[in-house]
Swiss-Prot record:
It comes from the Eukaryota. PROSITE patterns: ZF_RING_2. GO terms for biological process: vesicle-mediated transport. The gene is zfpl1. PANTHER family: ZINC FINGER PROTEIN-LIKE 1. CDD domains: mRING-H2-C3DHC3_ZFPL1. A zinc finger (RING-type) spans 53-101. Residues 296-320 are lumenal. It is a single-pass membrane protein. This is Zinc finger protein-like 1. The chain crosses the membrane at residues 275-295.
Length: 320
């Protein structure tokens, strides 16, 4: 057992083999994340340590590390690769520490900085989220972009040659069809433009001839009214016809004074006013209580036989 040198001054049995100091779990996570840390008894038995990862045999300081609840330290990438090689239906108890065969997942009732850091790191991969009881992360499937953009079939060129004669008749048919759709007089188009000016706009396309095409767009977007302003105004001033002659409560003026009209911002004047009102009410209540108690005490004293001088045997009235 030893005392950690951090400001917390916690008693701990953990010992950093590299810096040769006692460390608590808070310092272990903050300042000794890549150090070999075990119990002080192990240090007394054997002070030698291996600074390399036991999975890839490279320095632990070269990559990101992950410390299990048994305090064994590994490269996070090596531990992740080792876990992904197991079958997807492996139970959480099947994930074991490569060094001491301890559990990889911290117990649910364990509360410590090391366990919290390990849970946060394990929650980033799917194989560990299932063991922690978290929903899996959806992995987007890569889109195959190897499809050719030009999918034109040039195998049958005879169809193009045979239909070349029919293409010459297409402009005439197209012009006739266009005339059928564009047979709207100019006056009618302008009339529709003048009528629909207030509701929706009209676009007039004029050709070289006397034909034109009028395209009426959809109605303009409706205006959205904010009902919160109306509700806010009702809270501030209530002066409707139905409520104008309604009987108000007796203490409505007091509630109106005590209510904070400025929202979260309180003015000094309103605070002083509320304080004075509360003070006056308190004084009036105190005086009323004193008056009531005095009347009740006098009434009880008048009816008390012990205070009646005629009933006192030691007092003789009208006798010599």
């Amino acid at each position: 057992m030893g005392l950690c040198k951090c400001p917390k001054r916690k008693v701990t049995n953990l010992f950093c083999f590299e810096h040769r100091v006692n460390v608590c779990e808070h310092c272990l996570v903050a300042n000794h994340a890549k150090c070999i840390v075990q119990s002080y008894l192990q240090w007394l038995q054997d002070s030698d340590y291996n600074p390399n990862c036991r999975l890839c045999n490279t320095l632990l300081s070269s990559k990101e590390t992950a410390r299990l609840v048994c305090y064994d330290l590994f490269h996070w990438s090596c531990l992740n690769d080792l876990a992904t090689q197991l079958p997807p239906n492996t139970a959480p108890a099947g994930y074991r520490c490569p060094s001491c065969q301890g559990p990889v997942f911290p117990p649910s009732n364990l509360v410590s900085p090391v366990a919290a850091t390990l849970r946060e790191k394990l929650s980033t991969v799917n194989w560990a989220r299932a063991g922690l009881g978290l929903p899996l992360i959806e992995v987007a499937e890569p889109v195959d972009d190897t499809m050719s953009h030009d999918e034109t079939d040039y195998r049958d060129w005879s169809v193009v040659n045979s239909s070349s004669d029919n293409l010459s008749e297409t402009p005439e048919t197209t012009s006739q069809t266009g005339y059928a759709y564009n047979s709207v007089p100019t006056s009618v188009a302008q009339h529709s433009l003048n009528v629909n000016m207030s509701q929706d706009h009209a676009v007039t396309i004029r050709d070289t001839g006397s034909d034109s095409l009028t395209i009426n767009a959809g109605s303009s977007p409706r205006k959205v009214y904010d009902t919160r302003e109306t509700a806010r105004g009702q809270d501030a001033v209530i002066d409707f016809d139905d409520d104008k002659y309604r009987r108000r409560p007796t203490l409505s003026w007091l509630a109106r004074i005590l209510r904070n009209r400025s929202g979260s911002k309180s003015r000094p004047a309103s605070s002083m006013q509320r304080f004075l009102v509360i003070l006056i009410i308190g004084v009036l209540g105190f005086l009323t209580l004193i008056l009531l108690m005095s009347k009740l005490g006098r009434a009880s004293a008048d009816n008390d036989p012990n205070l009646d001088p005629l009933l006192n045997p030691h007092i003789h009235v009208g006798k010599e």
